[in-house]
Amino acid sequence: MKKADILVLDFGSQYTQLIARRLREQGVYAEILPFNVSLTDIKAKEPKGIILSGGPASVYATDAYFCDKGIFDLNLPILGICYGMQLMAHHYKATVAPAGHKEYGKANIEIKKDNALFKNLPKKQTVWMSHSDKVENLPQGFEVLATSENSPFCVFGNEDKKFFALQFHPEVQHSEFGKNILKNFAKYACNCESVWNMGSFAKTQAEKIREEVGNDKVLCAVSGGVDSSVVAALLASAIKEQVIVVFVDNGLLRSREKEQVEFMFKNTLGIDLISIDASEIFLSRLANVTDPEQKRKIIGNTFIEVFEEEAKKHKDVKYLAQGTLYTDIIESSVVGASKTIKSHHNVGGLPEKMNLKLIEPLKEIFKDEVRALGLELGLSKEVVYRHPFPGPGLAIRIMGEVNRPGLELLRKADVILLEELKSTGWYDKTWQAFCVLLNVKSVGVMGDNRTYDNAVCIRVVDASDGMTATFSHLPYEVLENISRRIINEVEGINRVVYDISSKPPATIEWE
């Protein structure tokens, strides 16, 4: 079992993943586990500290979430955040009740006592609150470390036990010195060293791959995107002669995607590539299917079938490698009290029975860490910083049924969007950009004639790891040119809209 410097127990906060990210940014390896993980599993990870995340529940409610009380007897530093703070207070017999004044947004705190969390930080700072309950009295054995206007117990702790509790969220960017607070907890309370980086990760994963695979062969599924390209490069660095790299044209690719992928692997990466055209089988199975989850399941199942057929042509193939990321795992499974958001075709979409063992060397890292790993492995910036493209491809960018006419419309619109972003310098400034073909038509006028054609939505977002995102504030003239070109150059589209939703509450992809 992989060891972790700090374990984050997930009680359902939308920010839980950010806690792990902020710690990893400091070179400390943090891992997220469900709140009800067993004490045995916690001990097996040999953590140096534990963080209790926030969450939507109330500790006094009948359906409250509680972790194993034994964690408080492990002689490990513990940091409680929001719900985690209230849980710690509740455990030590303090009263937690509904707050008369709910707090959502920025607040000012004042540090009242020097302590490990606020070492070398200003006495007054701005933090981000998001809670509807409050701690009414100080738990026995604890002391106040900081206060806010609405909370005399905003931060409390027991420095002998190295237990600390925060009412606010240090993991979000709106908390002025949040990263420093988490870093101080890891460094001064937990005695963690900043040794986690992609160089050490690459070395560890290569050794793990060699040990697990032995003399068998690995079928590596690639899409041409960053994730699968990095997986292929990592496998090649570990067991190059045992890797069979396969690219499947599922009929759901962007314009000229197949040709670009083949060129990149053969000429840029120097990796032999087997290219399979399976577009007919994918599109036939997607016919008349409109439910997004069903689309993902069908695509996931069909991918595996195609790969298994290819594996039969090669001796000693026992493994299938995929570019599954930590974000995929989080969004596809119930981690702690968190809810399933959507199935990813390479996680929840997989059949329960496979004839190939799955190997996912990136499943413990986030997107920005994948990019850093790619550079560490020698991939070019052009490959590493390519915009993400989902495994299900354009199928989840067409609302409703997927068919060839719709795919062709979407491809043409997408080409124009990317051309305009690249020519204006906005492509490299954004995380992801694509078009969505909506399953609605609208009335328009072109020349002197009435039209009743399709509407396309432009989605361009800024992000660092894909867990959260904001819509990109593109200049009006850029948006205007994109809209004008799509309507004038793509027959069958007469309306273009811009998605100004952030994640959360929306996801980046529409399906």
UniProtKB/Swiss-Prot annotation:
Enzyme category, top tier: ligase
EC number: 6.3.5.2
Catalytic activity: XMP + L-glutamine + ATP + H2O = GMP + L-glutamate + AMP + diphosphate + 2 H(+)
Record GO terms (molecular function): ATP binding; GMP synthase activity
CDD domains noted in UniProt: GATase1_GMP_Synthase, GMP_synthase_C
Pathway membership: Purine metabolism; GMP biosynthesis; GMP from XMP (L-Gln route): step 1/1
Gene Ontology CC annotations of this record: cytosol
Keywords, alphabetical: ATP-binding, Glutamine amidotransferase, GMP biosynthesis, Ligase, Nucleotide-binding, Purine biosynthesis
Active site positions: C82 (nucleophile), H169, E171
Domain Glutamine amidotransferase type-1: residue ranges: 5-195
Residue ranges occupied by any GMPS ATP-PPase domain in the UniProt entry: 196-386
Subunit relationships: Homodimer.
Function: Catalyzes the synthesis of GMP from XMP.
Full protein name: GMP synthase [glutamine-hydrolyzing]
Species annotation: Campylobacter jejuni (strain RM1221)
Gene name of the record: guaA
